[in-house]
Amino acid sequence: MDKSISVMLMYLLTHLGLIFFLYPEDIIGSTDSAHWIPIVIGIIVHFVVISIYMKGLSFYPKWDIIRIYLNAGKAAAIIFLLPVTLYFFIIAILAVRAYSEIICIVFLSNTPLWSIMMLLLFVSTYLAAKGIEAIFRTGVLLAIIFLPLISMISFTSFQNINWYYSFPLFEQDFSFLTKPSYFKSFFAFAGGFLFLGFIQPVITYQRKKILLAALFLIPFFIFSVYIPILTFGEATAVTLHFPFVVVVETINISWFMFDRVTMFFLLTLITFSMLFISITLWQANRIISKCLPIIKPFYLLLAISVVIFVSCLMIPDWNSVGNLFLWNTPLRFFVLVSVPLSIYFLGLRFKRKVGHELN
């Protein structure tokens, strides 16, 4: 049964949870003008990557990427699945630690950080244990409830902007390509597309609808960066942590029954982030379960969650989180580039092999 709508919504929600928190600060910090250029480059890379990835997956209609790599040989499985698993661990650790820090700063300043991390990880682990269909059903429900709210807040955040701050529109050079913060910004692209290769054949979808979902994300990539700049100016926006969240704090909606729009905005994004963490845990568990079939997947998932929680406890402060995002850059680009390309070329080889056998 085609479930393209569910996959589209999951693709949107997992990316939105990454875009509004971390992406604006990295892009604003990478250049002092013409921010649309690094944004557009990232979006182009995003579309190229998911197009190649889904084209490669289309050669294997009933296979997930674990089976694809295992079919290619033990060496291919180790070369690609081992870094992917490590990447899942790292992004889960960073997501749990970063989002818990945000919750602690904005809502629960007197609550111990470890308890927030435990709660966030518990909910995500519970969802992952229920399986991919439960995660997707939860995603559809959250999309129905929260996507209109996110859209409303995004558009009402234009109320305090000054278009003068958008100039200059052109950059004399491309120095942002050498800035670590720009490479960190690809976290918003690299973590959210891999699940498309794990859900086959349980959940089927149409490629063009996923591209449509990616197209729908483009305004949010732009808004998340430009609204803080147009509100505060580049010189001020570059000094802010979570600049879009700060902008939301300035929004005044007279007909809204609650005083703090920020609270609902952040709670919405936190629910999206829990979906992202849960699907990341589920993917990591799928790979490890395939390698260790003698251990029940549920116990493996618990072990993964414990490792992630202990790792989060070992991160002392927010600066260390930023350093981990930076140190993770080579692995991030390895996954972003090598997985789609390898799936595509393995798919071409598989197609030729099947064609020869039929002839």
Q: Residue locations for each model-derived region?
A:
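Membrane-interface loop-to-helix entry segments
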Residues: 99, 114, 127-157, 328-340
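Extracellular/periplasmic helix-loop-helix junctions in multi-pass membrane proteins
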Residues: 292-299, 312-334
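Membrane helical hairpin/interfacial module
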Residues: 16-113, 122, 334, 338-341
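Hydrophobic, membrane-embedded alpha-helices of multi-pass small-molecule transporters
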Residues: 4-23, 38, 42, 46, ...
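Hydrophobic alpha-helical segments and their helix-loop junctions in multi-pass secondary transporters
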Residues: 89-96, 128, 145-171, 186, ...
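Membrane-interface interhelical connector segments
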Residues: 232-261
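Selective recognition of specific alpha-helical transmembrane segments in multi-pass small-molecule
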Residues: 41-52, 85-95, 124, 145-157, ...
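Membrane-water interface regions at transmembrane-helix termini and the short interhelical loops
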Residues: 29, 101-104, 121-142, 201-205, ...
